[in-house]
A protein has these predicted regions:
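Short, well-ordered coil/turn elements that cap or connect secondary structure elements
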Residues: 57, 85, 137-139, 165-167
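Reductase modules of NAD(P)H-dependent flavoproteins
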Residues: 141-181
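Edge strands and adjacent loops of beta-rich recognition modules
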Residues: 1, 7-11
């Protein structure tokens, strides 16, 4: 599928949220937790997990951490020799892929573990759980452990704390290896 960069937003000094717009006539069918491949004009592919549950947004949301020297991430952060990524730029998207997704028919507790931008598919899964709880079809305990070195690495900490208030039987446990700010 072709996709267009709708927006680029800083979530943390080294993390950006990129929203990709699909053609109006296309819908991407996927399960919360799956990933897509971005295919660049030179044929290089990069895989990124989608950070929104199906049906919550028309856009595909990706969380990108800067890896210095990275083919795509240097462009996202406007460093290196390639031109910086701009809104309205077009890429190809392929997918969905992956077997990491919420098993909605299970009766077992849900334990979610994430580190860094590995939070993206977890965010999509919790958004799906939110929709299921609102419909009255999800009654399982959920525990989310999100790890990082510093508090700033948990770039959606406030969102996780809001989920803890809003969702039934949901617990958020931030895990830091270096708690100094």
């Amino acid at each position: 599928l072709p996709c267009r960069v709708r927006s680029i937003e800083a979530l943390a000094p080294d993390v950006r949220c990129i929203r990709l717009q699909l053609p109006f006539s296309e819908r991407l069918e996927y399960l919360a937790g799956q990933y897509v491949d971005l295919i660049f004009p030179d044929g290089v592919r990069r895989s990124y997990s989608m950070a929104t549950a199906p049906g919550t947004l028309e856009d595909v949301e990706l969380h990108i951490r800067h890896l210095p020297g990275g083919h795509f991430t240097d462009r996202v952060f406007g460093v290196g020799s390639r031109p910086p990524l701009k809104e309205r730029e077009i890429f190809r998207l392929e997918g969905p892929f992956g077997t990491f997704f919420l098993r909605e028919d299970s009766d077992k507790a849900v334990v979610l573990l994430a580190s860094g931008t590995g939070f993206a598919p977890i965010k999509a899964i919790v958004e799906r759980i939110t929709a299921l709880q609102a419909a009255g079809s999800f009654r399982r305990p959920v525990r989310l452990y999100w790890g990082g070195r510093r508090p700033a690495d948990l770039y959606h900490d406030a969102l996780c704390r809001q989920w803890e208030k809003d969702l039934a039987d949901f617990q958020y446990v931030p895990v830091l290896s270096d708690a100094r700010p």
